[in-house]
């Protein structure tokens, strides 16, 4: 039995190829059925995200194994093998285990240390379990990878610092306000960055979110997801005074929030402070706003300096994380190798127990017939000893006759002899 990890990711393949190798949720069951129907495959998990498509497999060794699996992947996606082969990576046993642990820990992600990948790996594992048989070693590998990812996040600072603009904006807000559970946040825009910001804020249980956007329909989809109120851009002037935090990211060529608008809001708030985070390019907030008392304005450049510092911290933490992964992968492989002896150990124990039971029954019968207890126990001990050492004795004698000192020493060691 061999463990494999094969696939493509953002480092090995352009998006034009990655999008052709994805497995959609609607067809995942069909893909797993097809994969597990391959005679060499004992169990499989398919991980498919925007940045990677990977197969994690437990397989029986055979000739041309790599060719057979590449052919299946190409046939399933109707791809030319040469197109895929140049971008495909292939990891086996210890390397496969290490790769999965690195992926689950965020060490192989586009954004180093990002936490979302662990949830994606867990979902891939859960999805592949629905009606599909797993090899026990594959299941154990995934469960171990989950615990390793948790250990990496607990014992290192890999996820402690923001390295995306959206996350940095939320981190800044949490640093300035003791708790987000008492603040109102106005989000201006409804694009991808604001979507990420809104989800981060929801996770931190912000008291109230308001989303202002040019098109109400797009904003409403996000608002329904995070429990926010939707307003139009023209309503910002009137509603700005409610916001303790404003985070803006639109594609507007001109500023949306001006100095006068913020002055009016501060006056209505009796100069309670406002945090404005402008992550738009061009800027959504007039730079002069930063000169107002109690208005704290941060631009995308301010956030970028935070991100650069934090990324350096994450890279240092990644060195510690790699050490953890190497150690855990080595321990897992030691466990896996030990499993190959499990069946032999079970058979040996069963055989010994059978001898014990057989001789015990005879001894008990002799006692019931009134035989001398001491003599019966001595006979039991003598016969049990002889039956149990018979096979090892023959093996020792044969090794000696053959002049096989290496085998003789192995047998001595296995019998606990000095």
From Swiss-Prot:
Q: Provide the residue positions that the database annotates as binding NADP(+).
A: 189-194
In terms of PROSITE patterns, this protein maps to: GLUTR
Biological or metabolic pathway of the protein: Porphyrin-containing compound metabolism; protoporphyrin-IX biosynthesis; 5-aminolevulinate from L-glutamyl-tRNA(Glu): step 1/2
Classification via Pfam families:
GlutR_dimer, GlutR_N, Shikimate_DH
Identify the CDD domains for this entry.
NAD_bind_Glutamyl_tRNA_reduct
GO molecular-function terms, A-Z: glutamyl-tRNA reductase activity; NADP binding
Reactions this protein catalyses: (S)-4-amino-5-oxopentanoate + tRNA(Glu) + NADP(+) = L-glutamyl-tRNA(Glu) + NADPH + H(+)
- Where is the site described as Important for activity found in this chain? 99
Task: List the GO biological process terms.
Answer: protoporphyrinogen IX biosynthetic process from glutamate
Q: Which residues bind substrate?
A: 49-52, 109, 114-116, 120
Residues at the catalytic site: 50
Q: What class of enzyme is it?
A: oxidoreductase
List the InterPro entries hit by this protein, alphabetically: 4pyrrol_synth_GluRdtase, 4pyrrol_synth_GluRdtase_dimer, 4pyrrol_synth_GluRdtase_N, GluRdtase_CS, GluRdtase_dimer_dom_sf, GluRdtase_N_sf, NAD(P)-bd_dom_sf, Shikm_DH/Glu-tRNA_Rdtase
Q: Which residues form a coiled coil?
A: none
Give the record's family classification. Answer: Belongs to the glutamyl-tRNA reductase family.
Assembly, per entry: Homodimer.
Q: Which HAMAP family match?
A: Glu_tRNA_reductase
NCBIfam families attached to this UniProt entry: hemA (TIGR01035)
Q: Main role? A: Catalyzes the NADPH-dependent reduction of glutamyl-tRNA(Glu) to glutamate 1-semialdehyde (GSA).
Q: Recite the other comments.
A: During catalysis, the active site Cys acts as a nucleophile attacking the alpha-carbonyl group of tRNA-bound glutamate with the formation of a thioester intermediate between enzyme and glutamate, and the concomitant release of tRNA(Glu). The thioester intermediate is finally reduced by direct hydride transfer from NADPH, to form the product GSA.
Query: In its UniProt entry, what is this protein called?
Result: Glutamyl-tRNA reductase
Please report the organism this UniProt entry assigns to the protein: Citrobacter koseri (strain ATCC BAA-895 / CDC 4225-83 / SGSC4696)
> What is the phylogenetic placement of the source species in the record?
Bacteria, Pseudomonadati, Pseudomonadota, Gammaproteobacteria, Enterobacterales
């Amino acid at each position: 039995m061999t463990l494999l990890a094969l696939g493509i990711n953002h480092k090995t393949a352009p998006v034009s190829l990655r999008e052709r190798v994805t497995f959609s949720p609607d067809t995942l069951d069909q893909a797993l059925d097809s994969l597990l129907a391959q005679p060499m495959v004992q169990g499989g998990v398919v991980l498919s995200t925007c940045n990677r498509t990977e197969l994690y497999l437990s397989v029986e060794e055979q000739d041309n194994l790599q060719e057979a699996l590449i052919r299946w992947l190409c046939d399933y996606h109707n791809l030319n093998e040469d197109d895929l082969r140049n971008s495909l990576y292939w990891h086996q046993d210890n390397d496969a285990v290490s790769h999965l642990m690195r992926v689950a820990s965020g060490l192989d992600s586009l954004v180093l240390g990002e936490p979302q990948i662990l949830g994606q790996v867990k979902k891939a594992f859960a999805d592949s379990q629905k009606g599909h048989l797993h090899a026990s070693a594959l299941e154990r590998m995934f469960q171990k990878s989950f615990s390793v990812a948790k250990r990496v996040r607990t014992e290192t600072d890999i996820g402690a610092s923001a390295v995306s603009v959206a996350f940095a904006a939320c981190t800044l807000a949490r640093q300035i306000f003791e708790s987000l559970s008492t603040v109102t946040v106005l989000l201006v825009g409804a694009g991808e960055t604001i979507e990420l910001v809104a989800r981060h804020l929801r996770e931190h249980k912000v008291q109230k979110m308001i989303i202002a956007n040019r098109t109400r329909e797009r904003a409403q989809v996000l608002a329904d997801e995070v429990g926010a109120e939707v307003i139009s851009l023209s309503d910002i002037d009137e509603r700005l005074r409610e916001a303790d935090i404003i985070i803006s990211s639109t594609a507007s060529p001109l500023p949306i929030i001006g100095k006068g608008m913020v002055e009016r809001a501060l006056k209505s708030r009796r100069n309670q402070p406002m945090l404005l985070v402008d992550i738009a390019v061009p800027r959504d907030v007039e730079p002069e706003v930063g000169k107002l008392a109690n208005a704290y304005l941060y631009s995308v450049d301010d956030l970028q300096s935070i991100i650069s510092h934090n990324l350096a911290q994450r890279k240092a933490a990644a060195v510690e994380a790699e050490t953890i992964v190497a150690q855990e992968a080595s321990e897992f492989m030691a466990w896996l190798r030990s499993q190959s002896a499990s069946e032999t150990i079970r058979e040996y124990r069963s055989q010994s127990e059978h001898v014990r039971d057989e001789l015990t029954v005879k001894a008990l019968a002799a006692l019931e017939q009134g035989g001398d207890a001491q003599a019966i126990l001595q006979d039991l001990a003598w016969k049990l000893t002889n039956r149990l050492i018979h096979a090892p004795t023959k093996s020792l004698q044969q090794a000696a006759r053959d002049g096989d000192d290496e085998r003789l020493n192995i047998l001595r060691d296995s019998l606990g002899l000095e």
